Each structure stands twice: as structure tokens, then as C-alpha cells.
Design a protein with these regions (language model features):
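Signature of alpha-helical transmembrane segments in polytopic membrane proteins
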Residues: 1-149
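A short, structured surface patch at a secondary-structure boundary
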Residues: 339-400, 439-443
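N-terminal hydrophobic signal-anchor/signal peptide
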Residues: 1-29, 142-285, 454-455, 459-467
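Loop-to-transmembrane-helix entry motif
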Residues: 95-99, 103, 271-279, 354
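C-terminal terminal-structure detector
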Residues: 4-5, 394-467
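A hydrophobic, helix-centered structural microdomain
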Residues: 265-328, 364, 439-467
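Short, glycine-rich, amphipathic interfacial segments at transmembrane boundaries or analogous
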Residues: 236-237, 305-343, 404-422
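Membrane-cytosol interface motif
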Residues: 95, 99, 154-169, 302-325
Length: 467
């Protein structure tokens, strides 16, 4: 046991060194640029902009350390350090966005220090730095992925399942064959003794959506025998995780407040929605004009598409989107867009792929029908259909609907509604202003991921499809 813990700590230390290395290299590259270009007061062409950069040694270090801290913040939020946990391409997206965001923040800071907005035109050195850092990031990802594969070979796992088919879960695990290998599956019908004996033969176990009584027995057995265990959470588990711990004499208690956001949280969230909505409308106006022109030129139909959706407490409202389907696409009734939906126009495919079809919802945010972050709004009839299979689906209506959300960032467009509900409840139960800001940053990242914009599986019929 002692050796196992020491070995695990050694692995984590190696990965930590890799994290420190990439931050140090990126910071050193910026320091070279700072000393040799921006802080060089002898550059005659730039003297009038750099005459304010008279720093002593501590001043230089302040700029460089601040750069490192901002870089760490973006890398941490966007997942730039998560080699092995995320796919290589996801880590690369995160690194690119982190580097570009950090350099943009630093460049704005330099412009403020210089007290000259014309300074913003001298961007080529920082752009060059960004390109070099991206190249270094690619090399780092390849090297760290190789090291990770040696330190953490794929787990051979036992999967325990019940009435719900394990095929979808196995399919997801197989997509990360570098981390997980389901070597054996066993049904609850095999009996408790047989399953416990099989668990003892593995280093890792994954427990599917099975009754709580049996699941708890497996969890206790794994805990007692130091066996790594993964468990598909139930809706009640998500509530338990977010509960507050209180001590009443010698008896620990969990407190479930179940009251939604506090007044302070609601006020801050609304203020942030208004600020981001105003900035977003102004910044996105050229793009929205181009999209409107493209839609109009394609078939001459209406540019916008409005539809009734429901938000907090089931209140109906009109949501606005750029029209991505043919005119009268729902004359045969409401249905979700499928992966190969023939109703989607060529222009619609492009704007859906880029997630810009939802830009008009910035006005819904300003009006107050929606928030910038929250569960995506559904139609009343779709919600009722899901509630037949999942009575708890209405739990999503405890907060305002959102333009982006936890389920959009961590799920996929074709994630089954039951799993989307779990993701949305994770957001609702763990809400904070910091979580909102994190999800907004991560939304920028998913704009470039195809699986986030595909339709539902053509064969999906129910909210619990798992075959």
C-alpha cells in the first residue's frame, strides 16, 4: 500500500514538472520579447510609445510574473494542462486559446502603461510570439502525451450494469481507448458473491446506472480493497455532492437548501448578463449583418426564426435565431434536428457549425427572458415528452434558460436528454459567478468542435435512448 502511494505521488510529480515547464518556457519567451523589444528604450521608431516604460528591476519582474499568472489562469480554466484527461486536439485548442487570450490581455496592459492607444497598431511582435508559443505547445503536448501513456497505461476495467443497456457507455469508453479498456461486463443477475469475486480481479471498476442498494455495496467493497471505482451518478447524487456539511453535536448532517440563487447571486448574474449582452451585440453586429444577407440571398425567406420556449418556472417566451432550415420546416409538427436533417439549408449548416445561428438570442438576454449561462430552453411539448420518461426533467426550470450552459460545454448536441439533465443540475447545484465566467470562456473553445454542433442521432426516439 505504501509503495503504491509513493508510486502514484511520483507520477503526479512528473506531470507537475511538465506543467511547470510549459509555463516557464512560455513566460521566458515573453520575457525575451519584453526585454529585447518592448522595454528597449533605444528603439527610435518606437521611442515615443515606450518612453513611459522606465522600469527598475522589480518593475520588469512584475510584468513577467503577472504574465505567468494570467497564463496559468487561462490554461487552468480552459484545460491547457490536462494532457491525458482530454484528447490531444482538445488540449491543443485549449493551449491556442490560452496563449492568444494571455497575449491579448498583456498587450492591452502594455497599451495602458504606454498611455497611447496608437500602441495597439504595433502588434506584430506579439503575434509572432503567439505563433511560436503554439508551435512549442504542440511539441509539449506530444512529449507529455508520450510520458503520460508510460506513466498511466489504460485501465483494464470490469463494467457492472443492470436494466439499462451498457452499449452507449462502452462506446464512450472505447472512444478513449488510451485511458479505458472494458475487458469484461457483468450483469447484476450474476449475483452479489460472483460480482464481488470478479471485482477483486481488477484494478478498476465502472458501475453503471444500477439500484442504489447494490451500488453502495460495490462502492464499500472497492473502498475496503483499494480498488479504483467509477460510478455513473444518479440525479440524487448530484444533489448530495453540492450539499453543505454541518455538525449537529456528534452527528454529521447534510443540508440541502433547495432555494436556488440568493438575491446577491441573482443581482450579480443579471448585471453580468446586461454587460456581456451589450458588448456582444455591438461586437457581433457586423457578423449578424453578413449572416442576414446570406440567408436572404439564398432563398428570399425570413432572416429570423422565432419559436416559443420555456424558461425559469415554466414561463413561455419567444426565442430568436437565424433561420437555418427551410421555410415552414415544422408544418408536420415539432421535432428535434437530427444528424442528417434534410430541412437544414446550406447556409444553415455553416451557421450551425459555427454556432452563430444563436447570436440573436443576445437580445433575449438583454430583455431578461434568458441568461447568458443556463440550461438551454426547450419547447413545452418537448419538455412534456421528456417528462414522461424523466419526471425530474422539469428541475432544469429552477433557473433562467441560457445562451450557453454546462450541458453545451461538457456534453454534445446529440447527448441524450437524461445525461443533459444531469449536467444542467450540476450547474444549478454548484452555481457561482466564477462558474459562469469559466463556462463563457469554455464556450469559445467548443465553437471549433464539430461534435458540439451535430444533430441528435437519427434513431433517437426517447430521452433515455441507450442502445
Amino acid at each position: 500500500m505504501k509503495w503504491t502511494n509513493s508510486k502514484e505521488q511520483y507520477k503526479r510529480f512528473i506531470m507537475l514538472l511538465g506543467t511547470i515547464l510549459i509555463v516557464a518556457v512560455h513566460t521566458a519567451m515573453f520575457a525575451c520579447l519584453w526585454y529585447n523589444y518592448y522595454a528597449n528604450r533605444n528603439l527610435t521608431d518606437m521611442r515615443k510609445y515606450f518612453k513611459y516604460f522606465y522600469f527598475y528591476r522589480r518593475g520588469h519582474w512584475t510584468i513577467i510574473v503577472l504574465y505567468a499568472l494570467v497564463l496559468i489562469l487561462f490554461m487552468k480554466v480552459l484545460g491547457g494542462f490536462r494532457v491525458g484527461y482530454l484528447r490531444n486536439l482538445d488540449v491543443l485548442y485549449s493551449q491556442i486559446l490560452s496563449v492568444c487570450a494571455t497575449n491579448a490581455v498583456e498587450y492591452l496592459q502594455l497599451a495602458l502603461i504606454a498611455k497611447r492607444w496608437k500602441f495597439l497598431w504595433f502588434s506584430s511582435p506579439m503575434l509572432g510570439l503567439s505563433v511560436l508559443q503554439i508551435v512549442v505547445g504542440v511539441i509539449w503536448i506530444i512529449a507529455m502525451r508520450t510520458i503520460y501513456a508510460r506513466l498511466y497505461p489504460p485501465h483494464e476495467m470490469l463494467l457492472i450494469y443492470g436494466d439499462i443497456s451498457p452499449k452507449a457507455l462502452i462506446r464512450k469508453l472505447q472512444s478513449r481507448g488510451d485511458k479505458y479498456r472494458v475487458k469484461e461486463t457483468i450483469h447484476l443477475k450474476a449475483g452479489m458473491d460472483e460480482i464481488l469475486s470478479r471485482i477483486a480481479a481488477y484494478e478498476s471498476v465502472i458501475i453503471g446506472d444500477i439500484p442504489s442498494h447494490e451500488r453502495n455495496q460495490f462502492l464499500k467493497f472497492c473502498f475496503q480493497n483499494n480498488i479504483r471505482c467509477y460510478s455513473v451518478p444518479k440525479i440524487s447524487d448530484i444533489m448530495i455532492i453540492s450539499a453543505s456539511e454541518i455538525d449537529l453535536f456528534d452527528s454529521p448532517l447534510l443540508l440541502f437548501r433547495n432555494q436556488g440563487m440568493t438575491f446577491g447571486q441573482s443581482f450579480c448574474k443579471r448585471a453580468m448578463d446586461i454587460a456581456i449582452g451589450l458588448v456582444g451585440c455591438i461586437a457581433a453586429s457586423p457578423v449578424m449583418l453578413l449572416i442576414a444577407a446570406a440567408i436572404k440571398l439564398y432563398d428570399g425567406g425570413p432572416v429570423l426564426y422565432s419559436q416559443e420556449r420555456i424558461t425559469k418556472d415554466g414561463r413561455p417566451f419567444q426565442i430568436y435565431k437565424f433561420r437555418s432550415m427551410i421555410v415552414e420546416s415544422e408544418k408536420r409538427g415539432a421535432r428535434l434536428a437530427s444528424e442528417h436533417d434534410d430541412r437544414i439549408t446550406p447556409v444553415g449548416k455553416v451557421i450551425r457549425r459555427l454556432h452563430v445561428d444563436e447570436l440573436p438570442q443576445l437580445f433575449n438576454v438583454l430583455i431578461g427572458d434568458m441568461s447568458f449561462v443556463g440550461p438551454r430552453p426547450e419547447r413545452e411539448e418537448i419538455t412534456k415528452e421528456y417528462e414522461r420518461s424523466i419526471p425530474q426533467f422539469r428541475f432544469r426550470l429552477k433557473v433562467k434558460a441560457g445562451l450557453t450552459g454546462y450541458a453545451q460545454v461538457y456534453g454534445q448536441y446529440n447527448t441524450v436528454p437524461y445525461d443533459k439533465l444531469k449536467l444542467d443540475l450540476t450547474y444549478i447545484e454548484n452555481y457561482s459567478l466564477w462558474l459562469d465566467m469559466k463556462l463563457i470562456l469554455l464556450t469559445v473553445k467548443i465553437l471549433f468542435q464539430k461534435e458540439k454542433s451535430e444533430g441528435v442521432d437519427d434513431s433517437q426516439k426517447t430521452a433515455l435512448k441507450d442502445v
